Curated annotation (Swiss-Prot):
Family named by the database record: Belongs to the DapB family.
UniProt: NADP(+) binding residues: 36
Protein task: Catalyzes the conversion of 4-hydroxy-tetrahydrodipicolinate (HTPA) to tetrahydrodipicolinate.
Residues the record lists as binding NAD(+): 9-14, 35, 98-100, 122-125
Catalysed reaction, written as an equation: (S)-2,3,4,5-tetrahydrodipicolinate + NAD(+) + H2O = (2S,4S)-4-hydroxy-2,3,4,5-tetrahydrodipicolinate + NADH + H(+); (S)-2,3,4,5-tetrahydrodipicolinate + NADP(+) + H2O = (2S,4S)-4-hydroxy-2,3,4,5-tetrahydrodipicolinate + NADPH + H(+)
Highest taxon above the source species: Bacteria
Entry-linked NCBIfam families: dapB (TIGR00036)
Pathway in which the depicted protein is active: Amino-acid biosynthesis; L-lysine biosynthesis via DAP pathway; (S)-tetrahydrodipicolinate from L-aspartate: step 4/4
Name of the molecule in the record: 4-hydroxy-tetrahydrodipicolinate reductase
InterPro entries the record matches: DapB_C, DapB_N, DapB_N_CS, DHDPR_bac, NAD(P)-bd_dom_sf
Active site (catalytic residues): 155 (proton donor/acceptor), 159 (proton donor)
Broad EC category: oxidoreductase
Originating species: Actinobacillus pleuropneumoniae serotype 3 (strain JL03)
Length: 269
């Protein structure tokens, strides 16, 4: 049976890539596409907006107008995603959430929703990035207590949150491995006379420029040597393909909160 996918933010950069990824994938089809109220794209064919030709799926501005989907993929903004979660819970729809920038209350709302529906919630849907998470845990075990750790990330000028959700996830993987709390050990800005760096800090640096899709590098810097673990995304299709893969994996789950570690079975490496 073909899995039907709904996409919110269908006219955005990520939305168009998601439509293309669904079109190219086996065992799935586009069932619904949505944009914000007032968008000039409402009523347009989603496939034509994405540049793949007509699909017969018209973009709507209201989830209740088209419930022809099993899984909703959401890469929008926290306030919108939280409303979409309410709809999916009420209508028994599964979700793949790639939105970043949630506060603690937003994350708690996602956890609560996962008691009723199945959700994959990840900061990054790239297979490579999720493999990097595991490599960072390995490096932290070996070097973390004896070196300085810095997370450096770069994204396009339109990204609205900083540090990126992926950078924060990298820091969280490292902090958890070292038994540290990122809220107290993370340093997110340095300016002026800061004093010497503390050994147990996990530093973050952010770059916003041009059309950078996404670059992340983590330094484990000791006296006389430095290990760098890096990932560069060259196309948003990397994230879109991963999200569709997550949606297909999620189809067999009735409820629960999962991430790409579960989808890729990385804990069994």
């Amino acid at each position: 049976m073909t899995l039907k996918i709904g996409i919110v933010g269908a006219g955005g950069r990520m939305g168009r890539n998601l439509i293309t990824a669904v079109h190219n994938a086996e065992g799935v089809e586009l069932g619904a596409a949505f944009e914000r109220k007032g968008s000039s794209l409402v009523g347009a064919d989603a496939g034509e907006v994405a540049g793949i030709g007509a699909t017969g799926v018209k973009i709507s501005d209201d989830l209740s107008q088209n419930t022809n989907f099993d899984v909703l993929i959401d890469f929008t903004r926290p306030e919108g995603t939280l409303e979409h979660i309410k709809f999916c819970v009420a209508n028994g729809k599964k979700m793949v959430i790639g939105t970043t920038g949630f506060d603690d209350a937003g994350k708690q709302a996602i956890q609560a929703a996962a008691e009723q529906i199945s959700i994959v919630f990840a900061s990054n849907y790239s297979v490579g990035v999720n493999l990097v998470f595991k490599l960072l845990e390995k490096a932290a075990k070996v070097m973390g207590d004896y070196c300085d750790i810095e997370v450096i990330e770069a994204h396009h000028r339109h990204k609205v949150d900083a540090p990126s959700g992926t950078a924060l996830s990298m820091g969280e993987h490292i902090a958890k491995t070292l038994g540290r709390d990122l809220k107290t050990h993370g340093v997110f800005a340095r300016e002026g006379i800061t004093g010497e760096r503390k050994r147990d800090e996990i530093g973050f640096a952010t770059i916003r420029a041009g059309d950078v899709v996404g670059e992340h590098s983590v330094w484990f810097a000791d006296e006389g040597e430095r290990v760098e673990i890096a990932h560069k995304a060259l196309s948003r299709m990397t994230f879109a393909n991963g999200a569709v893969r997550a949606a297909k994996w999620l189809n067999t789950k009735q409820n629960g909160l999962f991430d790409m570690t579960d989808v890729l079975d990385l804990n069994n490496l």
